Curated annotation (Swiss-Prot):
EC class name: transferase
Name of this protein: O-acetyltransferase ptmV
Keyword Transferase belongs to the record: yes
Organism: Penicillium ochrochloron
Subunit: Monomer.
Region described as Disordered: spans on this chain: 181-203
Statement: the UniProt record of this protein carries the keyword Transferase: yes
Gene Ontology MF, one: acyltransferase activity
Similarity remark: Belongs to the fumigaclavine B O-acetyltransferase family.
Role of this protein: O-acetyltransferase; part of the gene cluster that mediates the biosynthesis of the indole diterpenes penitrems. The geranylgeranyl diphosphate (GGPP) synthase ptmG catalyzes the first step in penitrem biosynthesis via conversion of farnesyl pyrophosphate and isopentyl pyrophosphate into geranylgeranyl pyrophosphate (GGPP). Condensation of indole-3-glycerol phosphate with GGPP by the prenyl transferase ptmC then forms 3-geranylgeranylindole (3-GGI).
Pathway field: Secondary metabolite biosynthesis
Length: 494
């Protein structure tokens, strides 16, 4: 009997907060010698698994006696090992032919051919945590990646892609960012809080406890597929110069208003706060337009974002840790703030509108400041104490299969700093030229795509919303003022 690649290990509580699905994307590489590139990638994948064997593992229920119900673990492959790297040759197919985004009716099938696994794991088969598919085109390579999100977060995805690139460069690739020892140490830090949950925080909104997932997930899949037919997915770009100008304008408004200062300190918002708030504002503007009296807006609107906690603990998590080192930020703002209707029930919004009026700014700019400041203030509460409280809360959950993902109107994942475009695959391939994400299936799901290197930097946003809402978003004067809509094949430095 052969020795297993690695010892099975349990997932952390934070891993169990993530829905059981794959995060998938495509990277494209124009290359002159496709056959040489395929060989390079196959060798690189073998090198990667030799150094990081856990990436060949499978997700399964933990069968160790005495563990909590719902505990999941990563197991080494049993029996005949299935390749982590798949290769497909697409005769007479070109990179340009593959770049068109799929129609709503196709449900993303234009991209599915290049991805290694479906969005949902196949429950009647072993569930791999990582797969890559090498698609050999006539004029280049399309790499399709799939990461099981219950095991690997967005920062971890970027780290794995960069280390895969290093392995493809062979001896010249240098040391990996991922250390097997640091993976284990980081998991231990995320398993033990050192105390009870902090009573100042209520974690039920972010991590509600519900009934276990139904055994028949096929019905859930079919519901999502049907819902996806009503969705539209588009890529938008916001030039970084416009983001910086708008951010400085908002921060000036905050500096000009003593009433907005937090305990004597000057408040500020970041570029990410600004981009998220602009999207959130414009979506509610077009979902609940003033001229449509048939639509009654809700009293408030909510957003959820993942926050990287690797540097937020007193004993920081290793930057190369690939597991879920994230907690959820969930923030609600009264709908009147989005619809430019400040009232007595929102003194913060009223102060923003008063300051904007005094400085000669428009009403939507006051709303933007109000929303961005709410996000920034919530982010500032996610410190070491908060993170430890979340970990402790999850330690006390009697059945990990009951931990759910809190419901909000919008879910935003920022991949801005995961470093995918920094991956250098070597002389035959170099850096990725494009990253593409399959069409979304859920209304209100957004990705801020990774930062590119170039002389004309921009923020790229992958937006999935209802078809009618998308039409109104494209026509919204504020959104149109700052964005450029292009298919992913054209999202290049200009």
């Amino acid at each position: 009997m052969s020795k297993p690649l690695f010892e099975a290990y349990p997932l952390t509580g934070l891993d169990h907060t993530i829905p059981p699905c794959y995060v998938r994307f495509l990277l494209t590489f124009p290359v002159p010698d496709v056959a040489l590139a395929v060989n390079q990638l196959q060798k690189g994948a073998e090198n990667l698994i030799e150094k990081l064997p856990f990436l060949a593992g499978y997700l399964a229920s933990c069968e160790t006696p005495g563990v909590r119900p719902g505990q999941l673990e990563i197991r080494p492959p049993a029996g005949e090992r299935r390749p982590v790297c798949l290769v497909a040759h697409h005769s007479n197919s070109y990179l340009a032919d593959s770049s068109a985004t799929s129609t709503t009716e196709q449900l993303g099938t234009a991209n599915e051919n290049y991805l290694p696994v479906p969005f949902f794991p196949e429950l009647d088969k072993p569930v791999p945590i990582f797969r890559v598919k090498v698609n050999a085109m006539t004029d280049g390579i399309i790499l399709g990646f799939a990461f099981h999100h219950s095991v690997i977060d967005a920062t971890g995805m970027g780290t794995i892609v960069r280390d895969f690139a290093r392995c493809c460069r062979g001896p010249d690739g240098g040391p990996l960012e991922i250390s097997l020892e640091s993976q284990q140490d980081s998991r231990e830090k995320l398993r033990h809080s050192g105390g009870p949950p902090d009573p100042r925080f209520d974690h039920n909104g972010e991590y509600p406890l519900v009934a276990s997932l139904p055994a028949d997930l096929e019905a859930m899949k079919q519901v999502l597929i049907q819902t996806a037919r009503l969705m539209s997915t588009q890529y938008f770009r916001i030039p970084a110069s416009l983001v910086n100008t708008l951010k400085e304008s908002c921060n000036r408004m905050l500096r000009e208003s003593p009433a907005l200062r937090d305990e004597g300190e000057n408040p500020w918002i970041s570029s990410n706060d600004l981009v998220v708030s602009l999207l959130w504002l414009c979506l509610n503007r077009v979902r609940y337009p003033e001229d449509n009296t048939n639509v009654i807006p809700p009293s408030d609107s909510s957003v959820c974002m993942a926050v990287n906690i690797r540097g937020r603990l007193q004993s920081p998590i290793d930057p190369g840790y690939v597991g879920n080192a994230i907690v959820l930020l969930r923030e609600s703002v009264g709908m009147n703030a989005f619809l430019h209707k400040p009232g007595d029930d929102d003194p913060l919004g009223a102060q923003c509108y008063e300051t904007a009026k005094r400085l000669g700014r428009e009403a939507w700019e006051a709303a933007l400041v109000r929303i961005a400041l709410a996000i920034r203030r919530k982010l500032n509460t996610i410190n070491a104490s908060y993170v430890r409280s979340v970990i402790s809360y999850l330690e006390d959950v009697p059945d990990l299969s009951t931990v759910a993902f809190g419901q909000t109107d919008y879910h935003i994942s920022s991949w801005r700093d995961i470093g995918v475009y920094e991956a250098d695959f070597g002389g035959h391939m170099g850096h990725p030229s494009e990253m593409r994400v399959p069409d979304g299936m859920v209304d209100g799901m957004f990705y801020i795509l990774p930062r590119r290197q170039g002389t004309h930097p921009c923020w790229e946003i992958h937006v999935t919303i209802h078809q009618d809402t998308m039409k109104r978003l494209i026509a919204d004067p504020v959104w149109a003022r700052y964005t450029v809509r292009k298919p992913s094949s054209l999202c290049r430095d200009e």
